[in-house]
Amino acid sequence: MEEKMNIAVFAGSFDPLTIGHYDIVTRATSFFDEVIVLVNSNVSKHSLFSVDARVRMAQAAFSSMDCIRVESFDGLTVSFLDRVGARFLIRGI
């Protein structure tokens, strides 16, 4: 029987990605098999950087860590969790 991966999602606008975001994600890697940094698109919110630019910044920040991937999504976070089979949502303070 195949063991399920523990996948966690850390969702946010990351406009821009901060050292605090980076710290939360890297700490989460010790608890989960995979951490997905989910860059949300909110058209009603004015962004400093485009979604593509924010994704590229996050990909560059986490490029040396194989257990972290970066994606963008413009729907509900819970829909993304279902789509990727994630059971955990990481929250910062």
Predicted regions and their residues:
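Nucleotidyltransferase catalytic core that binds NTPs
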Residues: 1-93
